[in-house]
């Protein structure tokens, strides 16, 4: 599982700038789970072979008693609880403050691995200028400048060092390709637990309620109609009764990690609430992760015809990037519409792992070009020669030719539609990559 790093510090020390630096390798795909005045932001990052999740928080005042600062303090405590390691950010130019001491006291009591870093340190020399930060009792301080990109690699190295991470290639155990790893994702109270209770039965659900840390992968194997599945915990799977905040607060990270570990994600929406920002963020994360996806609208029986029509239009606009996914209207509590969902899950998994031969891909490509040529860009018109498969789950198609950097996104979508139709690809994203051949004449002219 990906390690989780929380950025903590008082307001305006540059946490968000550090967050953007640490997540830039994955285009800073941010899951901004709305609902509070200042909530936690989640993003993906990568350093060498190691990937991680970063949580950005609001300014932290541990003893805040009311208003926005109380909410921000609550969010920061939850971020720290979710994290494997904390990066405590202070301001190198402003120096140490009473708030810094309060935060340090809070972190020391937790005993969680913590890296102390002084941001805005550009142009400052190490030594006496940073000695005051030793008062915080958190060891050495690492000077960085997020705005200039200085010290970021050292910062992540220090953060990940206490976790003793194995090489991802060595850590990964071979998975049985016949088993579908399924994650049920969705915001709180959309009916995840009700749906899974219906699938597995109450006795099986108990096995999810195990003690463990954020990085524990909890899953339950089961079989349906001869197909083996492994259901990955997304932190909505708990016994009936009171759901304590200490449990609920892990839901976001576990959802992101479950999506990463799944073959297929069932994204559950609430018909009575419509498509929320949080739904759209989770859907975007699924797409960015390249996972096959099935949409299910729960509580369909609880809305009238007008609400249904409004919801369908909302899905068409707000989740347009998932138009390749099957959509099902269900009622988990009444067990209505569930059987077709299984068929779509199996179909999405098969589509994500479909093998496509080079001769067929090339034929489809040339037929598509003959029917509609790519748009000319100045003196250049892209020339496409052949295509082959570059990967599965999700399917990747690599197209070779000349001047392919001028191919528009609209034309790529046109090609994607042709490939999808031929290979019956439903429920999986597709990646199309363009590779232009070496042109010695162009190189010669530019020399």
Curated annotation (Swiss-Prot):
PANTHER family assigned: GTPASE DER (PTHR43834:SF6)
GO terms assigned for molecular function: GTP binding; ribosome binding
Parts of the chain that traverse the membrane: none
UniProt subunit comment: Associates with the 50S ribosomal subunit.
Name this protein carries in UniProt: GTPase Der
Disulfide cross-links: none
CDD domains, per database record: EngA1, EngA2
Pfam families: KH_dom-like, MMR_HSR1
């Amino acid at each position: 599982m990906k390690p989780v790093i929380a950025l903590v510090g008082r307001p305006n020390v540059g946490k968000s700038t550090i967050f953007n630096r640490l997540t830039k390798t994955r285009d800073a795909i941010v899951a901004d789970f709305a609902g509070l005045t200042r909530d936690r932001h989640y993003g993906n990052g990568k350093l060498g072979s190691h990937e991680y999740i970063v949580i950005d928080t609001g300014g932290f005042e541990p003893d805040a008693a009311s208003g926005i600062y109380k909410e921000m303090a609550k969010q920061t405590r939850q971020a720290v609880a979710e994290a494997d390691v904390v990066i405590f950010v202070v301001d190198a130019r402003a120096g140490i403050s009473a708030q810094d001491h309060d935060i340090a006291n809070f972190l020391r009591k937790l005993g969680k691995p913590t890296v102390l870093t002084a941001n805005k340190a550009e142009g400052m020399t190490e030594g006496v200028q940073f000695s005051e930060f030793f008062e915080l009792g958190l060891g050495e301080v690492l000077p960085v400048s997020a705005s200039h990109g200085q010290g970021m690699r050292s910062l992540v190295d220090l953060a990940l060092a206490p976790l003793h991470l194995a090489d991802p290639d060595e850590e990964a155990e071979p998975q049985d390709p016949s088993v579908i790893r399924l994650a049920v994702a969705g915001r709180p109270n959309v009916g995840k637990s009700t749906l899974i209770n219906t699938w597995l039965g109450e006795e099986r659900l108990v096995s999810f309620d195990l003690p463990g840390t954020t990085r524990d992968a909890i899953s339950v194997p089961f079989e349906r109609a001869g197909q083996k599945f492994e259901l990955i915990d997304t932190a909505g799977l708990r016994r009936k009764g009171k759901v304590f905040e200490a449990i609920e607060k892990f839901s976001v990270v576990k959802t992101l990690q479950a999506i990463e570990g799944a073959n297929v994600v069932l994204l559950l929406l609430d018909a009575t609430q419509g498509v929320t920002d949080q739904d759209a963020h989770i859907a975007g994360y699924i797409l960015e992760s390249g996972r096959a996806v099935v949409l299910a609208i729960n509580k369909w029986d609880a809305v009238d015809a007008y609400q249904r029509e409004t919801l369908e239009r909302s899905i068409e606009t707000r989740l347009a990037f998932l138009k390749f996914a099957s959509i099902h209207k269900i009622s988990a509590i009444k067990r209505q519409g569930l059987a077709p969902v299984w068929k779509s899950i199996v179909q999405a998994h098969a589509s994500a792992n479909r093998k496509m031969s080079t001769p067929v891909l090339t034929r489809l490509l040339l037929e598509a070009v003959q029917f509609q040529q790519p748009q000319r860009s100045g003196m250049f018109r892209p020339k496409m020669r052949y295509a082959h498969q570059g990967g599965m789950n999700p399917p990747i198609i690599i197209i070779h030719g000349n001047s392919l950097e001028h191919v528009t996104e609209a034309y790529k979508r046109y090609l994607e539609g042709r490939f999808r139709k031929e290979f019956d690809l439903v429920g999986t994203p597709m990646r199309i990559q363009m590779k232009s051949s070496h042109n010695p004449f162009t190189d010669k002219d530019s020399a």
